[in-house]
Swiss-Prot record:
<protein>
    <recommendedName>
        <fullName>Protein nucleotidyltransferase YdiU</fullName>
        <ecNumber>2.7.7.-</ecNumber>
        <ecNumber>2.7.7.108</ecNumber>
    </recommendedName>
</protein>
<feature type="binding site">
    <location>
        <position position="107"/>
    </location>
    <ligand>
        <name>ATP</name>
    </ligand>
</feature>
<keyword id="KW-0464">Manganese</keyword>
<dbReference type="InterPro" id="IPR054838">
    <property type="entry name" value="adnlytase_SelO"/>
</dbReference>
<feature type="binding site">
    <location>
        <position position="247"/>
    </location>
    <ligand>
        <name>Mg(2+)</name>
    </ligand>
</feature>
<comment type="function">
    <text>Nucleotidyltransferase involved in the post-translational modification of proteins. It can catalyze the addition of adenosine monophosphate (AMP) or uridine monophosphate (UMP) to a protein, resulting in modifications known as AMPylation and UMPylation.</text>
</comment>
<feature type="binding site">
    <location>
        <position position="84"/>
    </location>
    <ligand>
        <name>ATP</name>
    </ligand>
</feature>
<keyword id="KW-0548">Nucleotidyltransferase</keyword>
<feature type="binding site">
    <location>
        <position position="177"/>
    </location>
    <ligand>
        <name>ATP</name>
    </ligand>
</feature>
<keyword id="KW-0547">Nucleotide-binding</keyword>
<comment type="similarity">
    <text>Belongs to the SELO family.</text>
</comment>
<feature type="binding site">
    <location>
        <position position="120"/>
    </location>
    <ligand>
        <name>ATP</name>
    </ligand>
</feature>
<dbReference type="GO" id="GO:0005524">
    <property type="term" value="F:ATP binding"/>
</dbReference>
<keyword id="KW-0067">ATP-binding</keyword>
<keyword id="KW-0479">Metal-binding</keyword>
<keyword id="KW-0808">Transferase</keyword>
<feature type="binding site">
    <location>
        <position position="256"/>
    </location>
    <ligand>
        <name>ATP</name>
    </ligand>
</feature>
Amino acid sequence: MTLSFITRWRDELPETYTALSPTPLNNARLIWHNTELANTLSIPSSLFKNSAGVWGGENLLPGMSPLAQVYSGHQFGVWAGQLGDGRGILLGEQLLADGTTMDWHLKGAGLTPYSRMGDGRAVLRSTIRESLASEAMHYLGIPTTRALSIVTSDSPVYRETVESGAMLMRVAPSHLRFGHFEHFYYRREPEKVRQLADFAIRHYWSHLDDEEDKYRLWFTDVVARTASLIAQWQTVGFAHGVMNTDNMSLLGLTLDYGPFGFLDDYEPGFICNHSDHQGRYSFDNQPAVALWNLQRLAQTLSPFVAVDALNEALDSYQQVLLTHYGQRMRQKLGFMTEQKEDNALLNELFSLMARERSDYTRTFRMLSLTEQHSAASPLRDEFIDRAAFDDWFARYRGRLQQDEITDSERQQLMQSVNPALVLRNWLAQRAIEAAEKGDMTELHRLHEALRNPFSDRDDDYVSRPPDWGKRLEVSCSS
């Protein structure tokens, strides 16, 4: 089957990019590709048999028209000016059989006009982390970009140490960012901001294109998508680590995996980015930061959208967030209905977990085994303060009895939303260290495991992290 690529971005937004081709690596070789995703995108298996090829930027497929996008943004709350694709190149937009499209974006593809002081490269460590994280999030049911392939090489890349240059093929319906809008707003070119909005609506919100107040309706949906995404992050214990406005997806996708981390111990103020000295992007601050970022996006639209309409959309954020979060947390607790004591029970559990540094993922997974008519709980042994746990658990069992559902039905529901497996940093690090020595076995094994996060396991993928794996420091270096 011949793949079809179109050039909407290149044709319709000529002032938002620089056309250029990838710069290949030395002795590049394909070490992993996503068979399931490739099948979904109807990519012939033969494309994965010619070593690096398109996956390493050595050649292009017919119809591809590569370009690097320009955007700007606020980083750690401060205006950073022009940024852009400093090491990534959009190779093309694949047209799928159902009429939708998928960007092919090659990360680590070499210098671009937006590289600033960088070298345009990515390292094996960061490409492995992003591939694992994006696929983990996908199988958790959370909107995200996807990883299609990883290429490593003999090209040295200089970070804190000398590392192997690598490339990641990332795919997504769109790479539209809040930062695209900010770029032209701060250049005082509101007509180009409007062109971006029209492009987004025309291709991704086409049902709104003929509406008289299409910009208000569109921005309201952007707010809702963002709120829903953040709610889902919070329920699985995911910390993004670098929620700059240029890393915010207009479509509500998890974008740009850098110093991310899933909670091990339940620590509300968890900071996964060792460069985040003030804790701006801490786990519990993510909902507030997302709203702040939406406010920055709203500002860019103010030249052609009524401020009252923008504020009305922003005001809806909190309720959408709380609705999605509340629904998912009730499912995680096994509640079939909404009762007034639910929030208090959840907050008391969180207080217990925070005091005892309980493992976030294991706690909710073990809670899924609760039998409402039994005073015993496998979770009890996880707590030092047994009396406090017993008090909470008695009230929790009482709450369960308010819903007309069998234990087996409730347990099945809870196990479908409480994963046994998340991508803990130590698991990723183990795969990275093996890969850096030339052994890709653990990389492939972990990718396969992450496809079934809600299945019971009895291996170390679902155990507490070893001492060396706790609080691994991760930076933005990639």
